[in-house]
């Protein structure tokens, strides 16, 4: 068990004052009263603190305390760790955070879960306990505090300091094109297809998923702050090349297509847009199969989550996603590569040459080598269906 001597506690009101101080650029002590809170505040007043969200990825994505970093401690990590995790395992994509922890540059780390009221209530095998143990071994000079009541209490008392996933604002219906416009926006006299209704959906603050119709609506793109588009098709036009950055991945939506050979290139493109503080719309024709596959691969790679978890996360935002069976097979292979090689990859350099599309690399030259089968046994699709339904999809209507 994590004892009181090993883990200090912090009241939600203290964290709120600390966040106020940081937002106001303030130095000096924020003051504080109450058992345990005053001592924790004294620890944090002299430098920057780190917030670690110890909840699952889906919970963190639905809502989190602003500025927090989500740790990775899923079932795969726990099974491999056998009760002892490293910073590379719980913070695989946060190289700078790991370096700052090891250098003692954080005055304190505040960990929180969903609702743990006290340190003594933590289970020995809980994520918080495993994270605290990793911090004790790798960041000995850093003090650690548990946020009392966790995210549930803090978000209830101070929602203004939390970020939550919210529905996109309603986007006005399309304006009929003028006689000088030749864009085919995909509308018919019988109404807008299901996959074109509404607007693009936010997967992450910098990553959106939609259809070719959405990519042809400049009003939608501007309203969302889109700066770049990733066109996952061989036939969808790039309508506004003078206004947005474009990248094309010419993949067909059929069981012979090798979309996995594009995963790393797509992930690097999305990251490049994010690093420039931009936003990217990933689209194909319908925003159902090819572009959804790219978004799933991105989540699996960057968030180190399993396909099932990534699929649920994306489907909550765009219910009609349905990668074809071959793409699902390639994603499962990708999951295996990401999760089974992550221990070695987490300690390796994030850069390295990509394997040539369509060719296997016999000798590893980078942290990941993807050599996926491009033919997965499937039954022929009925001629009236434009895509194959995912085996995870519960019904064709989804």
From Swiss-Prot:
The active site is at residue 284. Phosphorylation in the C-terminus by ERK1/2 inhibits proteasomal degradation and stabilizes the protein. GO terms for molecular function: MAP kinase serine/threonine phosphatase activity; MAP kinase tyrosine/serine/threonine phosphatase activity; phosphatase activity; protein tyrosine phosphatase activity; protein tyrosine/threonine phosphatase activity. Residues 45-163 form the Rhodanese domain. GO terms for cellular component: nucleoplasm; nucleus. Its EC number is 3.1.3.16, 3.1.3.48. Keywords: Acetylation, Hydrolase, Nucleus, Phosphoprotein, Protein phosphatase. The modification N-acetylvaline is found at residue 2. The keyword Hydrolase applies. Residues 199-340 form the Tyrosine-protein phosphatase domain. Its main location: nucleus. It comes from the Eukaryota. GO terms for biological process: dephosphorylation; negative regulation of ERK1 and ERK2 cascade. Gene3D superfamilies: Protein tyrosine phosphatase superfamily, Rhodanese-like domain. It is an enzyme of class 3 (hydrolase). SMART domains: DSPc, PTPc_motif, RHOD. Pfam families: DSPc, Rhodanese. It catalyses: O-phospho-L-tyrosyl-[protein] + H2O = L-tyrosyl-[protein] + phosphate; O-phospho-L-seryl-[protein] + H2O = L-seryl-[protein] + phosphate; O-phospho-L-threonyl-[protein] + H2O = L-threonyl-[protein] + phosphate. InterPro entries: Dual-sp_phosphatase_cat-dom, MKP, Prot-tyrosine_phosphatase-like, Rhodanese-like_dom, Rhodanese-like_dom_sf, Tyr_Pase_AS, Tyr_Pase_cat, Tyr_Pase_dom. PANTHER family: DUAL SPECIFICITY PROTEIN PHOSPHATASE, DUAL SPECIFICITY PROTEIN PHOSPHATASE 4. Belongs to the protein-tyrosine phosphatase family. Non-receptor class dual specificity subfamily. Hollow spherical complex composed of 24 subunits with pseudooctahedral symmetry, has a tetramer as the basic unit. Regulates mitogenic signal transduction by dephosphorylating both Thr and Tyr residues on MAP kinases ERK1 and ERK2. This is Dual specificity protein phosphatase 4. It comes from Mus musculus. The lineage of its organism: Eukaryota, Metazoa, Chordata, Craniata, Vertebrata.
